[in-house]
Amino acid sequence: AVSPAAATAFLGAQLGAGLAVLLQLNDFSKLLGASSLALVATYPLMKRITNWPQAFLGLTFNWGALLGYAAVHGTLDPYVTLPLYLSAASWTLLYDTIYAHQDKDDDARVGVKSTALHFGDDTKKYLAGFGALSTAGLLTSGAAAGLGAPFYLGVSAAAAHLAWQVRDVDLDDRDDCARKFKSNGTYGGLVFAAIVAGKLAGAG
C-alpha cells in the first residue's frame, strides 16, 4: 500500500512537473491550463455524487485536446477543438465504462456510482452511442482542420476497432473487460496515425 506521505510527495512532484511545462507556454495556454484545476480537484468526488463519473473523467482527462491546440496557435478554433474535445470525452466514456464493469460488484457493495452500474444491461447500447459520437467528433474536427483523405481512412479503421470492442466485449468477464480496455491503445494509435497522415496530405 502507498502511504499518505508517499502519495503526497508523488502528487507534489507531478504538480511541479506540470507547472514547469505550463510556464513554458503562451499566456492564453497558461490560463487555459490553470482553469483545468477545478475539474482535476473535483473529479475524485464524482463517484459519490453522480452516476456519470466517467463523463466527468472524460472532460477532465481530455483537457489536453484544448491545451495542445492553444499551445501551438495561442487561441482556440472552436470548430476544430470542441468536436475534438467532445470526441475524446466520448471515447473516455466508452473505455472507462468497460473498465468500470470489472469493479461493478465491488462498487455496488461499497456504495459508489458508475456508468457501468447505471446502464446495467443496456450498457452496450450506450457504448455504441459513445463510439458514434467519438467518430462523428473526429470527422467534424478533421474537416474543419482541412485534413486530407488519409485521415478519413484512418478514422474508419479506428471506428471499426471501437465497433469490435462494443460487439465483442463480455461485460460480465473481468478479464475480457481488461483486454478490451487495454486494446484502446491500438485505437489511440490509429487516431494518431490518421491525424498525422491527414495533416501531411492536407498540407500538400
Model-found features: residue ranges?
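Solvent-exposed interhelical
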Residues: 1-19, 88-140, 169-181, 185-188
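Intramembrane alpha-helical segments
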Residues: 1-83, 140, 163-170
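A short hydrophobic/aromatic micro-motif that marks alpha-helical segments and, especially, helix-coil
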Residues: 18-20, 41, 65-68, 75, ...
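Alpha-helical transmembrane segments
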Residues: 28-35, 56, 79-91, 126-129, 136, 147-154, ...
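Alpha-helical transmembrane segments of multi-pass membrane proteins
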Residues: 40-44, 87-92, 99, 157-164
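Extended hydrophobic alpha-helices typical of membrane-associated regions
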Residues: 140-204
